[in-house]
Amino acid sequence: MLHFPDPFATGPGPVIPAEALGFILAQGLRECAAGLGPLTARLGLSGADLAALRDRFAPGLELPDLDLPRPEAGPDQQAIETLILWRAGVATPEARWLAAILARRSMETRHLWEDLGLPSRPWLSGMIAHFLPGLAAANARNMRWKKFFYRQICSDAAFSLCLSPSCDDCDERAACFAPD
């Protein structure tokens, strides 16, 4: 496992478990190694943003694809990223990076924490609470994150069609509505 120093240990600001970003980067790197695309496409960030994230949380870590632009995002991914940034309550580079990563990984098929490579849902919720406090507060009912994102988007009167993922056919439906 990759080990990352906590850049907030001696400075002000939100405290984010650097290990969580290690899991996310490791997941992206595994997918790159498996031929699923460049790291920029796996995490939804430009190479420059990946380099800045690396410099902040994992100085010296070798990352591929740092010369690539940010991949184009589809409408669902853009809507989720906009929602996250709007609800976040903070305007930091770290919040912007995490919003892009969460939106991109929300396009995958499993639970968001699994698609991020995190050990459990509480890791995801804890990272969001530290990094995107307004988003965490908005999810007061502790709804599963992907479901929460789509419910928030679909509740907007401007949306006439919502492509929310269907839970009824999922084998893990009971787990989604169980306490953490």
Swiss-Prot record:
GO terms for molecular function: molybdenum ion binding. Signal peptide: none annotated. GO terms for biological process: nitrogen fixation. The keyword Ligase does not apply. Pfam families: NifQ. It comes from the Bacteria. Keywords: Molybdenum, Nitrogen fixation. Probably involved in molybdenum processing. Belongs to the NifQ family. This is Protein NifQ. The gene is nifQ.
